[in-house]
């Protein structure tokens, strides 16, 4: 197995499933830290701030720092502020998205007369929120969605994801959003900029082919699939472009790296 200078690592299905740590996750991060290999946690979860993500990882005894976390909310805020500094935004989403947009100098409004409509996972979504978002897009606001995941793994099973919520506005308006998170290149390019490395020097680690693995493939990066979440070994082997590597878990990845 190739030795990479850095790793981009998914969270849900790779580091943990819901509130349960996945076997090998802590060991993999400990291995990278001992070797002095930088890594970033890249997640489509827009509801949490980097500090909240870090706290969850630390509760599982997985080493993490806020500056090592790249959320779809952060990538979304950066994308908008680079295009339109100080723009007005109507958003659906949690505290992670609200904080990211505000700290990027964007103005959050509660009506449809805005420059951007941004959809992130909102566990308190209502018809009125969707109505305002729909009117905003119809009024000409640029339509952004943090990530396309139509379902998310939870302890109860697979629940509606942000892609499902986004589809309500998209179907109603006939407008397709610009997605920011995996598998889109935008969040991956942002992560590479933070690392200061070329895509050939970095590998993407994740469980879900359609988001994690495709995000690496879409930017020309090597990919490491772990069979600890959604996509099985059979799933990824049957794809037109399979991952560079597929392991039972991250313990198996460590064993390969140590050869």
Swiss-Prot record:
Q: Which Gene3D superfamilies match?
A: HAD superfamily/HAD-like
SUPFAM superfamilies given in the database record? HAD-like
Q: What GO cellular component term, any one, is given?
A: cytoplasm
Can you tell me which residues the record assigns to a coiled coil?
Answer: none
Q: Which GO terms describe its molecular function?
A: metal ion binding; phosphatase activity
The keyword Transmembrane is annotated on this UniProt entry:
no
Q: Which PANTHER family match?
A: 4-NITROPHENYLPHOSPHATASE-RELATED, HALOACID DEHALOGENASE-LIKE HYDROLASE DOMAIN-CONTAINING PROTEIN 2
- Under which name does UniProt file this protein? Acid sugar phosphatase
Species of origin reads: Staphylococcus aureus (strain MRSA252)
